[in-house]
Amino acid sequence: MTCTLKSPPKMASFFLSSLVLMFIAALILLPQGLAAYKLTPTYKPPDSELPPYRNFVPPFALNPVYNAPIYKTPNSPPIYNPPIYEAPPTYKPSKKRLPPPFQKLPPFYKQAPPSQKLPRVN
C-alpha cells in the first residue's frame, strides 16, 4: 500500500487523534484532581509537635516478663479462650463379626450329607 498526500494512513490518524484527546482530558482533569487534593488531603499531619511515634500509647504493660493488658485485672476472666481441640472421628468396627465371605457358600454349592449318595458322572 502506498502512502500519498491525498490519503494519509488510517492508523496514524487514529493514533494522533487519540493522543490529542488524551492531552485535552489531562488538561481538564489534572487541575480538578489537584484542587480536590488541596481541599481534602488524604494525609493530615499530627497536631502535636512531637514525632508520631512518641504519641503512641502501647496497649500492653511495659513489663518484659509479663505483658498483661492494661484494662485486665488479676481477678477478671480470660479475655480469649482458645477452642478446645477435638480429635477427628476414627473408624470403629462393629462388634458383631461376620464370617469371612469365602465361608458363606450359596445353597447349590453346599455339600450333600454323607448318607445321601450322588450319581456318578462319567
Curated annotation (Swiss-Prot):
One example of a Gene Ontology biological process annotation: nodulation
Top-level taxon of origin: Eukaryota
Annotated keywords: Nodulation, Repeat, Signal
Signal peptide from the UniProt entry: 1-36
Tissue: Root nodules. In early nodules, expressed only in the interior of the developing nodule with no expression in other nodule tissues, including meristem. In slightly older nodules, expressed in almost all cells of the central zone. In more mature nodules, expression is restricted to the invasion zone.
Region (10 X 5 AA approximate repeats of P-P-X-X-X): 45-117
Sequence repeat ranges per the UniProt record: 45-49, 51-55, 58-62, 68-72, 77-81, 82-86, 88-92, 99-103, 106-110, 113-117
Region described as Disordered: spans on this chain: 90-122
Induction note: Expressed from day 6 after rhizobium infection. Persists up to 43 days after infection.
Protein name per the record: Early nodulin-10
